[in-house]
Amino acid sequence: MQRSPLEKASVVSKLFFSWTRPILRKGYRQRLELSDIYQIPSADSADNLSEKLEREWDRELASKKNPKLINALRRCFFWRFMFYGILLYLGEVTKAVQPLLLGRIIASYDPDNKEERSIAIYLGIGLCLLFIVRTLLLHPAIFGLHHIGMQMRIAMFSLIYKKTLKLSSRVLDKISIGQLVSLLSNNLNKFDEGLALAHFVWIVPLQVALLMGLIWELLQASAFCGLGFLIVLALFQAGLGRMMMKYRDQRAGKINERLVITSEMIENIQSVKAYCWEEAMEKMIENLRQTELKLTRKAAYVRYFNSSAFFFSGFFVVFLSVLPYALIKGIVLRKIFTTISFCIVLRMAVTRQFPWAVQTWYDSLGAINKIQDFLQKQEYKTLEYNLTTTEVVMENVTAFWEEGFGELFEKAKQNNSNRKTSNDDDSLFFSNFSLLGTPVLKDINFKIERGQLLAVAGSTGAGKTSLLMMIMGELEPSEGKIKHSGRISFCSQFSWIMPGTIKENIIFGVSYDEYRYRSVINACQLEEDISKFAEKDNIVLGEGGITLSGGQRARISLARAVYKDADLYLLDSPFGYLDVLTEKEIFESCVCKLMANKTRILVTSKMEHLKKADKILILHEGSSYFYGTFSELQNLRPDFSSKLMGYDSFDQFSAERRNSILTETLRRFSLEGDAPVSWTETKKQSFKQTGEFGEKRKNSILNPINSIRKFSIVQKTPLQMNGIEEDSDEPLERRLSLVPDSEQGEVILPRISVISTGPTLQARRRQSVLNLMTHSVNQGQSIHRKTAASTRKVSLAPQANLTELDIYSRRLSQETGLEISEEINEEDLKECFFDDMESIPAVTTWNTYLRYITVHKSLIFVLIWCLVIFLAEVAASLVVLWFLGNTPPQDKGNSTYSRNNSYAVIITRTSSYYVFYIYVGVADTLLAMGFFRGLPLVHTLITVSKILHHKMLHSVLQAPMSTLNTLKAGGILNRFSKDIAILDDLLPLTIFDFIQLLLIVIGAIAVVAVLQPYIFVATVPVIVAFIMLRAYFLQTSQQLKQLESEGRSPIFTHLVTSLKGLWTLRAFGRQPYFETLFHKALNLHTANWFLYLSTLRWFQMRIEMIFVIFFIAVTFISILTTGEGEGTVGIILTLAMNIMSTLQWAVNSSIDVDSLMRSVSRVFKFIDMPTEEGKPTRSTKPYKNGQLSKVMVIENSHVKKDDIWPSGGQMTVKDLTAKYTEGGNPILENISFSISPGQRVGLLGRTGSGKSTLLSAFLRLLNTEGEIQIDGVSWDSITLQQWRKAFGVIPQKVFIFSGTFRKNLDPYEQWSDQEIWKVADEVGLRSVIEQFPGKLDFVLVDGGCVLSHGHKQLMCLARSVLSKAKILLLDEPSAHLDPVTYQIIRRTLKQAFADCTVILCEHRIEAMLECQQFLVIEENKVRQYDSIQKLLNERSLFRQAISPSDRVKLFPHRNSSKCKSQPQIAALKEETEEEVQDTRL
């Protein structure tokens, strides 16, 4: 970044914002980059501002029982705030004084007042000076207030972030990620631009009092008629506002429904394509869109009348003020023109400025109170450690995640029983609730000495992760004692990758030791993976590390924990995503050898790990089931496997699981709302399911993963598009909103890779931060960076003869705080938080406007209609002028009406009224025409929005995966949320305003040109200057806006990243490191935002200066060239003032239109995406009703005579090559093999070898070459949809969308209830579905959060059974499953798919043992394709992975003659607790 010219700028340069000229010039000539932006002043840095506010807030907390955040803000910013407020007031006062001088100038042309003619020129000079003074006062004042608002936002951003890192886990579990982002976006947004309006609360009353005093002097009591009308108008607008709020609330629910389904569709687009659900999803979303648009139209009409009421009120204000006085006393011309000018100022103050100011204060105080409540929430308390102890001891420890559960369930049950429902099964729904709060851990005792390994095992939900949380201090024990040294390292169950390089992720801010680092890399088996990257370990990983496989992420996470020098290592199921061989190697080399001298607690259920552990702790339902050594376990608890894992008690187990699931559901739906929910209030919010899921989404626009991925708010609209809070009302005229979105800024955690093998996060709308922290989203973007990470080496050359273990054990330097400010610059940060750069030009092209206008043919006719009415209005005004011009002098005094603006002009004398009545008649007619001309325009523009949404949705659903993989899910969702909302809400009324203002200016110029042709000559260069200035500014402005928007992404991404890794952050003590990173992200955004504000003020000031020059010219031309016509001077000067203020508004409005049209450009970009191959490449006849045509059957003799394909499931693969993108590197090369009908094939290979990719290639979800035949039919000879329907799919990432059970199982409604129930029975879902009210019609929301992961897998299995597919693709179906569900899946595969071809990708050996053939993939190619016997006889990967016990199971006859094998204890499930509901971990 460059040094800012502001530092050396003179006072004049600062006053006129001339210091921004270099950036404006550069932006006009070339594209701006981040390096072109100026550095921020030190006073605006996040460090300084946050320190200042934090100091005052701490002082407030220390001194008062009820601390007020507003007091801390007042002490920081009050005096500067008031100084700029006084400047603003003085600027507004000049507006009130201008009409006085205008009246004196007009009066000087009165034939009876000739003595004042000589001073007219001086009055003109005075009037012009007032304009100059106003310009010099207003612009610095507005900029100063915006600047203070920015500083307040930055300080509070930082304060909230710091508080977030300190919150206790219990508090985090009650706060949704959406609420946190809401605090950092819409609430704080109110300060940025709202602060400039805040002063009008006291300025407007003073201004109204001054104006009414001046008008009283002219018109006496009749002045209050106009004021009365304005007050009535303001109340009318308030009423319209309330009506609009009602429609907004109704519509918000519908938008939520649509966006939830859309986000689920985008997130699971691969599954949608695999299931061939494109048409079903499109129909579902379009139906919701239709309902939404009905309310959109109603809201738009109300807003239109609200907006047009202001435009058309000017005539009535003047008319009502002047008429009573004229009828009673008669009136002179000077008073009319002076009154018109006064009324213009009065109208703006009463109907616009005051309501905006009140709304600003209401919003700001509400935001401050919310932030204040948040800052007082309970903080995380670190346990008291004993640094001298070397052992880890737990004595009689009991802990609860939450107290008061009993009351909650009791009240919820009563509430449910009181509810009148048509369903008799509600009692079932609550029948299994425990009415007592159960401890997550109870009476736990163990003791391990230094250097020992404790293995913690247990079933899903037993409390293993909670045990580690308690040791770390995240969970407070209610009873008992915990003792350890406090120097902890932690590896999370779900690997957490921060944006940065691999090296930075492993070192994690700790001092760098080259040799320790290398030993850790080797022990964690990362060397081979790192060597594949061109930048080695300096490759920059985006959010979540999307380019890495799940196993690679898990190993990096483990390496981070191992690299830190600690006394106690907590490893929470670190091997969940590793293949058997890699897991075995890492356990031996890392956990057993490298860390041999360290105290380790490993959560695992693998028998091999239990055997090697010094001590074993087995948990069951939160209690200690066993504690001791492995040999003791075999002797004392021979039944522990079946007891814990529930093999012998399926019915009881599933009932318990359902109980925990529904209990968690009740808790989640009961804890909604922004404020802390007391237990006594929960009955109002108890769990409720209805036929429509929209009711529960009143405050949510995105489901939680999209809350995580993207939070967007629409600009300039009261509709809140990120929908976090229901009581947050955005000001109507918000120019910018600080919410992440891509082009207008988007915070995106990019879509999960379609072939990623890591964990997935099921969508939940009100997902708590705690749940967020227990899930990993495999998202991010790979960015290549040339420069290596800047890290400081602190170790010297290794001493001779040091072993790897010695090097590892050597204590690292205690100096762990890197010099962050020196080592992390904005460029690095920007790279880490990489975001897609849009290839959209800085200014909207004419082609975009043309395409937009021609989307709907009616729009052209509506625009012509608007033009015709405008011409009629101008013609009527000119006719009246002509009529007056031809009136005999004695009758002069009639009426001139210029219906160009709402600013009516009356010229009358008391002698005659008949022209006055003509004027009123013409005005009323034209008013009615003008009032309703905008309605067809608004209506048609909403129809255009409807068409564009439909086209874009169709385009996204039909786009190939190679295209969708290059886009981030947040970016796609932004098109459907933010951009469609702009097309629905903002664009119609902004275009209406612009057209209205443009026509007003043209009409006024036409009238002035008729009256005084000289002024028309002066107007032309001014308009040319305005157009040139706009074009010059717009180039830079839009680029700065783009950079500013992109600068928001790091802020919100960093917040979410920090929350996801919060336990890791705290365990490593890296909060200060991350606070500094956050401040860097804030400063990066501030630099862009400050420059945007400065250039915007430069532009506004230049417009004002042109206006002042024009007005000076007009004033002196009219004074010097007009003879005895006071009426002509009055019309010219009044219109000149109005022309220029309206022209300024029109220019600003045109910039708004251009900015909003960028949304249209983005939508068109998506509409123009390539589509998937919809037709076969060879010429064939179409298929009908799911069957191939007769011609196809004849051509393919393999197809049976009953016309059904596929019939057997034989599959032949020839030279298959797969790529992610066209022209990219092949991921799979020359794959060839064949599968017989009904055969089971297992895919083998290391993590990341391409097993899941092969399954995607079968479905043609990638760019493929080669050929695949099914039952003799080649994939080139039939359509894509028909090909995919041949497969049944159980994907790695389970897809449950918001809708009923029936819709989720059969979205096309092809099957009867009997058939669905039969299949549900087959897969073990009947008992689950029957537990819910409504059964098949029960509405699942938020990715099916009421279901366990196992139940979701069974849903996918049921879909495959219903599809009657002959080939089944299973991608790790047992990942995260409890053994019961796993047994159901195995049983169903044997029964329902007995005669089907099955291709299985699986890490569990026992599942693979059922396959007849195995396909081994290594280095993108087929290494082996053989039967299990051949693989076991050779030195293959499979032979290395399989244990002797599994070989005994496979071939018992080979061992029968040898010694009898020892009884084996079945391996415990290595589960990841992703779906544990009752412990919320």
From Swiss-Prot:
It is a multi-pass membrane protein. Residues 1387-1481 are annotated as: Interaction with GORASP2. CDD domains: ABC_6TM_CFTR_D1 (cd18594), ABC_6TM_CFTR_D2 (cd18600), ABCC_CFTR1 (cd03291), ABCC_CFTR2 (cd03289). ATP 1 binds at residues 401, 434, 458-465, 493. There is a cross-link at residue 688 (Glycyl lysine isopeptide (Lys-Gly) (interchain with G-Cter in ubiquitin)). SUPFAM superfamilies: ABC transporter transmembrane region, P-loop containing nucleoside triphosphate hydrolases. GO terms for biological process: bicarbonate transport; cellular response to cAMP; cellular response to forskolin; chloride transmembrane transport; intracellular pH elevation; membrane hyperpolarization; multicellular organismal-level water homeostasis; response to endoplasmic reticulum stress. Residues 1471-1481 have a biased composition (Acidic residues). N-glycosylated. Coiled coil: none annotated. Residues 423-646, 1211-1444 form the ABC transporter domain. Disulfide bonds: none annotated. The keyword Disulfide bond does not apply. Residues 99-122, 217-222, 320-339, 880-918, 1012-1013, 1117-1130 are extracellular. Keywords: ATP-binding, Cell membrane, Chloride, Chloride channel, Endoplasmic reticulum, Endosome, Glycoprotein, Ion channel, Ion transport, Isomerase, Isopeptide bond, Lipoprotein, Membrane, Nucleotide-binding, Nucleus, Palmitate, Phosphoprotein, Repeat, Transmembrane, Transmembrane helix, Transport, Ubl conjugation. A lipid is attached at residues 524, 1396 (S-palmitoyl cysteine). InterPro entries: AAA+_ATPase, ABC1_TM_dom, ABC1_TM_sf, ABC_transporter-like_ATP-bd, ABC_transporter-like_CS, ABC_transporter_C-like, CFTR/ABCC7, CFTR1_ATP-bd_dom1. It catalyses: ATP + H2O + closed Cl(-) channel = ADP + phosphate + open Cl(-) channel; chloride(in) = chloride(out); hydrogencarbonate(in) = hydrogencarbonate(out); ATP + H2O = ADP + phosphate + H(+). ATP 2 binds at residues 1220, 1245-1252. One of its GO terms (cellular component) is nucleus. Glycans are attached at residues 894, 900. It is found in: Apical cell membrane; Early endosome membrane; Cell membrane; Recycling endosome membrane. Epithelial ion channel that plays an important role in the regulation of epithelial ion and water transport and fluid homeostasis. Mediates the transport of chloride ions across the cell membrane. Possesses an intrinsic ATPase activity and utilizes ATP to gate its channel; the passive flow of anions through the channel is gated by cycles of ATP binding and hydrolysis by the ATP-binding domains. The ion channel is also permeable to HCO(3)(-); selectivity depends on the extracellular chloride concentration. Belongs to the ABC transporter superfamily. ABCC family. CFTR transporter (TC 3.A.1.202) subfamily. Monomer; does not require oligomerization for channel activity. May form oligomers in the membrane. Interacts with SLC26A3, SLC26A6 and NHERF1. Interacts with SHANK2. Interacts with MYO6. Interacts (via C-terminus) with GOPC (via PDZ domain); this promotes CFTR internalization and thereby decreases channel activity. Interacts with SLC4A7 through NHERF1. Found in a complex with MYO5B and RAB11A. Interacts with ANO1. Interacts with SLC26A8. Interacts with AHCYL1; the interaction increases CFTR activity. Interacts with CSE1L. This is Cystic fibrosis transmembrane conductance regulator. It comes from Papio anubis.
